[in-house]
C-alpha cells in the first residue's frame, strides 16, 4: 500500500515534509538545532506507518544539523506545457531553460559562509537555482518586514536573513535563479494570535489534530491575503518565483476531522486549494512572477482527494509549476509493486512522474512538473551519489527536465550533480537495488515488478486515507529529510 506523505516542510513542498525549524535566539545556530524544514513533506510519499510518524510533509523534523554558523553574516514535461510566467520586469533573474535547484533553509540563507559554499557548489555543477525560505513552518518571516499582520502576531521576532536584498544581489551576480518558499497552513504564530483564522472545533475554539497541531483554515480569505501580501513584498524585492508550501488541508486521521469545522466553507477542499492558487496568481500577475506549489507526491498517482484538497487535475492548470515530493523513502512497502521502495529510487521516481506526465497531458494549460528529490537518508540504503543521481536520471527518463533537491540542513551530495562540462565517466546509479553505470539502467528495469496503473492508484488512494505522514522524529533520520 502507498501512503501519502507530504514537506514539506511542511510541506518541499514541499516544497513541505520536515518543515520544523528549531527556534534559535541570536545570530549563531548551534549544532543541536533541529533544522528540519522540509517542504510540506508533501511529497510523494507512501510511508510505512510502522516506521514513520506523521506526514513528512507536515512537520517532519528531520535532522539535527547546523544550518548556519557562529557569526552569521547577514549580507548575505508535460506535452507542450504552458510556459511559466516571465521573470521580474527588471530582468535581473531570467528563468533558466531548465530549473535545477537546491533548498536553502533560512539559517543557511542568512549565513555568508554557507551561502558562499553553496554558490561554489553551483559554480562547479549543473545547479542554477536556490529555493530560499521566506516563511517556514515555524511561522517566522526570515527577513525584516513591516507587514502589519506579521508584526502583530510576532512573526518578525526571529530574523534569519538580515539583508535579503543583499542576498538577492549576490545571487544575481552568481547567475542563480532565486525562488521564495512560503509555508501557508502550518503557522503556529498566526493560529495562536488569530485563532479565528484557524480550523474551528465543534466544541468551540480552534481545532487541533491528535498531535496538538492547530491548522489554518484554507477557506479563510484573511489567511490568503496575509500570505499574498508577503509574496508581493518579496516579489517587489526581486524574487521571480513564489513557491507555496503546505498549501493544503491537515492530513490528520478521519477521527480527528470529525470535530473540525471550516467557517467560510465554499465548495470542496480541492475547490478551496484551487481557489487560493488561482487568486494568488491573479493578485501577483502584475509583478510578472511565476506562482508554484509544493504538493504531496501521492497526488501524481491518487485519483481522488485523499483529504488534503490536492487533486492533480484541480490545481495543475492554475500554477506555473507543480512540485510533487516524490521521495522514495516515503513510499509504502508494495508501492508500484516494489517491496522496498527506498532501495529503488530510480523506479519509484520514474513511476510517480510518469503518472504526472500522463495526467497533465489531458489538461489544457497544465503547468510544468518539477519534482522535489531526496538528498537525505531515511532508512536503508544510505542515500549517497548513486541514489540521488538515480532520481535525477529517472526524472529525465520520465520526460521531465527540472528538479530540486531537498535536504533540511541544506547539505548536498556534490558527486550526484553533473559537473560543468559533463561527467568524465558514466555516473553510477542505483537501479534494481544494484549499483550500475547509468547507461546500463534499461538492462535492469524490466526485472522490477510492477502493478497495473489502476491498481496502483487504488492502493495509493486507500493508504493515503489511513496513514498520517506529518512528521518524522529527528532521531529516525540519517542525514536529513524533508
Which positions does each model-derived feature cover?
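C-terminal motif of bacterial Sec signal peptides marking the signal peptidase cleavage site
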Residues: 8-10
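Bacterial signal peptide processing site
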Residues: 12-15
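Active-site-adjacent "subsite" loops/lids of carbohydrate-active enzymes
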Residues: 90-103, 107-109, 169, 180, ...
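An active-site-proximal structural segment forming one wall of the substrate-binding cleft
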Residues: 111-114, 120-127, 170, 212-247, ...
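Catalytic domains of carbohydrate-active enzymes, especially glycoside hydrolases
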Residues: 116-140, 235-241, 321, 395-402
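Aromatic-lined carbohydrate-binding/catalytic grooves of carbohydrate-active enzymes
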Residues: 125-159, 251-258
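Glycoside hydrolase catalytic-domain groove-lining segments
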Residues: 263-295, 299-376, 422
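Substrate-binding cleft of secreted/luminal carbohydrate-active enzymes
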Residues: 319-331, 345-350, 355, 359-446
Amino acid at each position: 500500500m502507498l501512503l501519502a506523505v507530504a514537506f514539506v516542510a511542511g510541506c518541499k513542498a514541499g516544497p513541505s515534509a520536515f518543515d520544523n525549524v528549531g527556534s534559535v535566539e541570536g545570530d549563531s545556530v548551534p549544532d543541536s538545532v533541529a533544522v528540519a524544514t522540509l517542504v510540506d513533506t508533501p511529497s510523494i510519499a507512501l510511508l510505512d506507518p510502522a516506521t514513520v510518524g506523521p506526514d513528512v510533509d507536515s512537520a517532519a523534523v528531520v535532522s539535527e544539523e547546523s544550518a548556519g554558523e557562529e557569526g552569521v553574516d547577514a549580507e548575505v514535461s508535460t506535452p507542450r506545457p504552458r510556459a511559466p510566467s516571465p521573470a521580474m520586469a527588471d530582468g535581473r533573474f531570467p528563468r533558466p531553460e531548465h530549473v535545477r535547484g537546491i533548498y536553502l533553509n533560512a539559517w543557511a540563507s542568512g549565513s555568508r559562509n554557507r551561502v558562499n559554499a553553496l554558490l561554489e557548489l553551483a559554480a562547479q555543477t549543473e545547479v542554477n537555482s536556490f529555493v530560499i525560505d521566506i516563511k517556514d513552518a515555524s511561522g517566522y518571516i526570515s527577513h525584516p518586514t513591516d507587514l502589519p499582520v506579521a508584526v502583530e502576531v510576532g512573526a518578525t521576532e526571529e530574523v534569519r536573513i538580515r539583508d535579503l536584498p543583499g542576498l538577492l544581489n549576490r545571487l544575481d551576480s552568481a547567475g542563480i535563479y532565486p525562488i521564495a518558499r512560503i509555508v501557508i497552513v502550518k503557522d503556529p504564530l498566526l493560529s495562536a494570535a488569530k485563532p479565528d483564522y484557524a480550523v474551528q472545533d465543534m466544541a468551540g475554539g480552534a481545532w487541533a489534530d491528535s498531535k496538538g497541531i492547530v491548522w489554518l483554515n484554507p477557506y479563510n480569505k484573511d489567511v490568503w491575503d496575509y500570505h499574498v501580501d508577503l509574496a508581493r513584498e518579496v516579489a517587489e524585492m526581486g524574487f521571480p518565483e513564489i513557491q507555496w508550501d503546505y498549501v493544503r488541508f491537515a492530513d490528520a486521521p478521519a477521527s480527528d476531522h470529525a470535530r473540525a469545522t471550516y467557517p467560510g466553507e465554499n465548495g470542496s477542499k480541492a475547490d478551496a486549494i484551487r481557489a487560493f492558487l488561482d487568486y494568488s496568481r491573479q493578485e501577483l500577475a502584475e509583478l510578472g512572477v511565476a506562482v508554484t506549489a509544493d504538493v504531496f507526491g501521492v497526488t501524481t498517482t491518487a485519483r481522488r482527494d485523499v483529504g488534503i484538497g490536492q487533486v492533480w487535475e484541480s490545481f495543475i492548470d492554475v500554477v506555473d509549476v507543480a512540485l510533487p515530493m516524490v521521495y522514495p523513502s516515503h513510499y509504502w512497502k508494495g508501492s508500484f509493486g516494489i517491496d522496498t521502495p527506498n532501495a529503488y529510487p530510480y523506479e519509484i521516481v520514474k513511476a510517480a512522474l510518469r503518472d504526472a506526465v500522463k495526467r497533465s497531458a489531458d489538461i489544457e494549460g497544465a503547468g510544468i512538473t518539477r519534482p522535489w528529490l531526496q538528498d537525505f537518508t531515511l532508512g536503508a540504503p544510505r542515500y549517497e551519489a548513486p541514489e540521488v543521481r538515480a532520481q535525477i536520471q529517472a526524472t529525465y527518463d520520465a520526460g521531465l527536465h527540472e528538479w530540486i533537491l531537498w535536504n533540511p540542513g541544506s547539505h548536498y551530495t556534490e558527486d550526484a550533480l553533473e559537473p560543468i562540462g559533463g561527467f568524465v565517466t558514466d555516473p553510477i546509479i542505483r537501479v534494481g537495488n544494484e549499483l550500475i553505470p547509468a547507461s546500463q539502467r534499461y538492462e535492469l528495469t524490466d526485472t522490477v515488478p510492477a502493478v497495473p496503473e489502476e491498481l496502483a492508484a487504488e492502493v495509493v488512494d486507500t493508504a493515503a486515507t489511513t496513514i498520517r505522514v506529518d512528521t518524522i522524529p529527528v532521531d529516525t533520520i540519517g542525514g536529513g529529510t524533508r
